Amino acid sequence: MSRSTSSDRRITRRKAILKQAKGFRGRRGTNFKAARDAVRKALLHSYVGRKDKKSDMRQIWITRINAAVRAEGITYSRFIAGMNKAGIQLNRKALSNMAIEDPTAFKAVVEASKKALGV
């Protein structure tokens, strides 16, 4: 019986890792062991980054809304409280886009929020 080796599978696996490490600097892009560790860490960072992106985007939306409502003479927290009282259900992404793309509609929402607060 002939002796079997894992050479084909091993070469394929190593090529795949080195392909993923293409563009990495120094030994991390050419040496298999270093590349394997670098690729693992890079994949972990990309996974975590996809989760963090959601929080970052929400923070950007809130900052944009805050800037837009302060121009109308009200703070962000009072604006959100007024929206809840008025029964306006718009998410922060929609409000942020509205503040940028349709300022007149956003101003109407701010006025409705102010009216609900009695300001």
Curated annotation (Swiss-Prot):
SUPFAM superfamilies: Ribosomal protein L20
Keyword field contains RNA-binding: yes
Gene3D superfamilies cross-referenced by the UniProt entry: 6.10.160.10, Ribosomal protein L20
Gene Ontology terms for molecular function: rRNA binding; structural constituent of ribosome
One Pfam family hit: Ribosomal_L20
Highest rank taxon of the organism: Bacteria
A single BP term in Gene Ontology: ribosomal large subunit assembly
Function: Binds directly to 23S ribosomal RNA and is necessary for the in vitro assembly process of the 50S ribosomal subunit. It is not involved in the protein synthesizing functions of that subunit.
PANTHER family: 39S RIBOSOMAL PROTEIN L20
Family, per entry: Belongs to the bacterial ribosomal protein bL20 family.
Protein name, UniProt field: Large ribosomal subunit protein bL20
Organism: Treponema denticola (strain ATCC 35405 / DSM 14222 / CIP 103919 / JCM 8153 / KCTC 15104)
Gene field: rplT
